[in-house]
Amino acid sequence: MTLSRTLSPQESADRLAIRELVDTYAHRADRRDLTGQLALFTADTRFVVYMDAASTEPTQDLRGRDALMPVFDDLNSYTATTHLNGQSRIAVDGDHATGESYRLAHHLVDWTETRTTTP
């Protein structure tokens, strides 16, 4: 079975640009760059998140750049974050593209102020 196909130079450039977009998103998330993160999305964006591997239903389905602000701002509640990007599937059709990217996100929380010991 052959999975390779010929890509035009333009489609190759488009796919690389989308992959760089995914990586820039993760970088800006880990730097707590809310303004920079939001700038990566169009006003009519759709942002779908699946956190439960056992479900086909999204955990979040947000529409529009403004809906992303509280989600991205919530990263400030963590001591540190690290986003590791995995595979991406990208479909390019002219000037429109859709895609699915896998990411492992680590969110570190400092519980020292709320931790209690049990006798």
Question: Where are the predicted features?
Answer:
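Short beta-strand edge/turn micro-motifs at domain boundaries
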Residues: 2, 96-100, 118-119
